[in-house]
Design a protein with these regions (language model features):
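Acidic, S/T/G-rich, low-cysteine, solvent-exposed domains in lumenal/extracellular/periplasmic regions
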Residues: 1-170
Length: 170
């Protein structure tokens, strides 16, 4: 979950990639791992997403830090309370191997990868860099406002906003 990286670190990463090195980029519009709890047990959102805008722009990659992937086909069933019944959560997806690049060593032996509040990447128009997606969503997916998914206590509400775009996202 890259945040507030120094100019020196950003430069080192950029030089590695520009010299032919590869980078695997995972970006997080909602930093779920940084959520804390108040003394009363209430969730306090971190309010911070990943930020690599300078590098992504230079590499010809687009990322919307205010959007998360919502996928109806791959939605995980979650229990939001101890006594609640499991229900699909569009912002939490379990991606099986058929959505992976089976030719790449990084993903070829994986079975399933789970994501919560996943960011989405795309290649910029006119980009000259090579953009090789390793994991894709289903086509029954859309981009949803990150603020709507953040701190969600009733995932059924997401279905009110969901309109599949017929697009597979990276």
């Amino acid at each position: 979950h890259p945040q507030e990286l120094s100019d020196e670190v950003l430069y080192a990463i950029d030089q590695h990639v520009m010299k032919g090195g590869q980078a695997i980029v995972f970006l997080d519009p909602n930093a779920d791992s940084l959520v804390t709890r108040s003394p009363q047990g209430a969730m306090i959102p971190a309010g911070m997403g990943s930020d690599l805008e300078v590098l992504l722009s230079a590499w010809g990659v687009e990322y919307q830090d205010d959007k998360v992937l919502a996928d109806n086909e791959l939605a995980l069933r979650v229990r939001m309370s101890q006594n609640g019944r499991p229900m699909p959560h569009l912002g939490m997806v379990g991606v099986p191997r058929e959505y992976f690049d089976q030719e790449d060593i990084i993903t070829s032996r994986l079975e399933t990868v789970n994501f919560a509040s996943a960011g989405v990447l795309s290649q910029s128009d006119g980009a000259t860099t090579t953009f090789e997606p390793l994991i894709r969503s289903s086509y029954d997916a859309m981009l949803m406002d990150a603020a709507l998914v953040e701190n969600m206590t009733d995932p059924s509400i997401l279905f009110d906003e969901f309109q599949s775009q017929g697009t597979s996202y990276v």
